[in-house]
Amino acid sequence: EDDSDVIRQCLRAAVDGPFFSDSEFHTLFGFERTTLRRIAESWPVWDDPVEQSDAVSNSFNNLLGYPHGRWDVWHDYITPISSEVARVFARWRGETGLNPSGEGYFNRLR
């Protein structure tokens, strides 16, 4: 998979997967699930690049760093293993790696 496909998979997983409850979705993502679904369905095209960037960043960050406890179904939604997804996220952010600590998670929230 190329990076764009991994991003698409992560957006779809965040929206359609069992990783995030409706009650905490807006708090975690800064979007309603319906908005993130529209961004995911239109990937990579979206009329607001800042909104799209926030959606991608928060999808990656929450899938990798939030304690969703659903690693058992990760591969039902996302093909690469989490360490490869983290490398894609780092490249997308223009970084060489990600700080895996809780502080790193909170620093990456948008």
Report residues per predicted region.
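Positively charged, low-complexity terminal tracts
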Residues: 1-110
